[in-house]
Swiss-Prot record:
Binding site for substrate: G62, G63, R84, N188
SUPFAM superfamilies: Carbamate kinase-like
Region forming the signal peptide: none
EC number: 2.7.2.8
Residues carrying the site annotation Transition state stabilizer: K27, K251
Keyword Cytoplasm on entry: yes
Gene Ontology CC: cytoplasm
Subcellular location as annotated: Cytoplasm
Lineage of origin: Archaea, Methanobacteriati, Methanobacteriota, Stenosarchaea group, Methanomicrobia
A molecular function (GO) term: acetylglutamate kinase activity
Purpose: Catalyzes the ATP-dependent phosphorylation of N-acetyl-L-glutamate.
BP GO terms, sorted: arginine biosynthetic process via ornithine; L-arginine biosynthetic process
This protein's name: Acetylglutamate kinase
Cited Pfam families: AA_kinase (PF00696)
Length: 299
């Protein structure tokens, strides 16, 4: 039975009180940005969070757009173990798409809906310092072969000072997942990883990962089989059972690292479902999967 509007608001009140003045890091996936309507709904929700006293930080991806741009420029996208092989030209295309297109678009939408957005990359304030990933070694026909995946990086240090300054001034930071190494080279880093690292550095209350599925499902074909809560100790067994599989494995593992590093809880939700973030945060049942550790068990 559909809840009356006043009941929805009353149900949300204790959550709003609990989350007031807290930091939440929200990772918006590239798939969510394919649809203008979905993107607008997400940004409206994030601006609303700011207006009820929550301090949101956005980390965005852009994989589909980068691939599309590469194809238009006549360059084939290549991947190795899920990582985009990033040569010099691909790195420039990634920067063009992430910083010049997606980041700017999100900041603009925040302004349209009444918020104050400001865009960043890891270069700004040397926010994300990283290093290039090591050359990969694989067996091809029984022969060990080296694979250089290019300017794909891992973060080493997050300097959150500039983010704290912006949050205190009521800005909503929007971060492109591009880091910088000790020599000033740009590095392409997985956006889920960046979001988790930034959430840990900011001591965020929540890490929210927007995907194209409604959290973890015991049966991928049955939305009603959603697992609403997962203890960190359950993750390995869920991977063994195949419930956590494919691209969800690095997302969940990254979220687990963030929780172990001080983030209270992490949430995996379907960003393509209208207002899913508000429903996950402000209703008792939620609509996604919440990850928690021993320090912050569900009440």
């Amino acid at each position: 039975m559909e809840l009356k509007r006043e009941n929805v608001l009353i149900e949300a009140l204790p959550y709003m009180q609990e989350f007031y003045d807290s930091i939440m890091v929200i990772k918006v996936g590239g798939n969510a940005m394919v649809s203008t309507q979905i993107m607008e709904d997400i940004i409206k929700d994030i601006v609303l969070l700011r207006y009820v006293g929550i301090k949101p930080v956005i980390v965005h991806g852009g994989g589909p757009e980068i691939t599309e741009k590469m194809e238009r420029m006549g360059k084939k996208a290549e991947f190795f173990q899920g990582l985009r092989i990033t040569d010099d030209e691909t790195m420039e295309i990634a920067r063009m798409v992430l910083v010049g297109n997606i980041n700017t678009k999100i900041v603009s939408l925040i302004g349209i809906f009444g918020g104050k957005g400001v865009g960043f990359t890891g270069y700004d304030g040397r926010m994300i310092l990283g290093h290039k990933q090591a050359v990969k070694r694989v067996l091809v026909d029984g022969v060990e072969t080296e694979v250089d995946i290019g300017w794909v990086g891992e973060s080493e240090v997050i300097n959150p000072e500039i983010l704290h300054i912006m949050l205190e001034k009521s800005y909503i930071p929007v971060i492109s997942p591009i880091a910088v190494d000790a020599k000033g080279n740009a590095l392409n880093i997985n956006a889920d990883t960046v979001a988790g690292d930034i959430a840990a550095a900011l001591k965020a209350k929540k890490l929210i990962l927007m995907t194209d599925v409604s959290g973890l499902l015991r049966n991928i074909k049955d939305p009603s089989s959603r697992i609403s809560r997962v203890n960190l100790d359950q993750i390995d067994s869920l991977i063994e059972e195949g419930i956590i599989s494919g691209g969800m494995i690095p997302k969940i593992k990254g979220a687990a690292v963030a929780v172990k590093s001080g983030v209270e809880r992490a949430h995996v939700i379907n960003g393509s479902v209208s207002h899913s973030m508000l429903l996950e945060l402000f209703t008792d049942g939620g609509v996604g999967t919440m990850l928690y550790g021993p320090d912050h068990p569900p009440v």
